[in-house]
Amino acid sequence: MGVSLAILHYHLRTGGVTTVIRNALTAQYDRNAAVVLSGPATDLAKLLDAYGAKDLIAHKVKVLSMAAGAFPDGPPEPNIRANIAAARRVFAEWPTPIVAAGYEIGTALPFPAASIEQDFAWSATHPIADAYRAYRPMPYDAPTWAMAALLYAVRPKENYFRLSEPGTVTVLDDGRTQFRASAEGMHRYLILDPDRKESIIRTYTEIASAKPVERKKKLAAK
């Protein structure tokens, strides 16, 4: 979310990323918004500082799905390591349920190189394929941390993933995440069901490479 909103802010010259997020949430029905974080938690931590933001989040957001951490344990994950203080604050103060797509999920569900090289050929340029090619020379299968967080957020009832028991995620000083189960906890993390692995990767490729649907032009007013 941080990267995409920063780009949106640059092009639209809005008052700032925090303003963009607040305006987007204000326009939503109560408990209707799903927030997806695919990078460092910097912008969401700044949002928590804004006047009335926590109440707004609590009323508008049903879940924060974030590509962050490593579960049940593991080394510091890059998104958290990029801004440890911001990640710690979001996990500690965000007022709605949080679901984390950990490092282990992204590495277990690689986006196929064959899809990157073939399925986007309908367009001379495509932001997804171009980004993968720019990151490193093809072919390579790309980890999908952000895609996992997004897929859970937009299709939670499809049961692509299992969820951990409720608990609390704490960000340690070195960037590692510690999960402690508790009935009153508001945090969970995604767990991969091996039987769903192929269907998840297939869903990734189908959605990511789909051609945009043309909008029908409105009839001119008589």
Listing of model-derived features with the role each one plays in the protein:
Residues M1-K222:
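N-terminal acidic, glycine/proline-rich low-complexity segments
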